[in-house]
Amino acid sequence: MGPPREARRSEVLRTLRSLEPELRAEGVRHVSVFGSVARGEDTVASDVDLALDLAPSSVPTGFQFVVYIDRLKRRLAAALSRNVDIVILPARRPELKEALSREAIPAF
């Protein structure tokens, strides 16, 4: 069955905070959790929805941006032992903006 939802959310936040120095070195300024994990509605099979605020000077462009995001996504998924979905801030889709304003829990 796995740990209770609040324990899973706390573990996700703890893990993200432990990665802060590494992520900041990669150009990540802030990370927030949103979606089912933030709402406490996740299951052990749920992915983790993360919103990343990136330092523009650290972010590659073109195809290298895709490689950069893929590397971040794989690193985060490995650390969290769960699939990860990433939204890059600022969110442009209205429904994402709304979800983030309602649900986002900052990790750092």
Whereabouts are the PLM-identified features?
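Catalytic core of pol beta-like nucleotidyltransferases
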Residues: M1-H30, A38-G40, V44, S57-F108
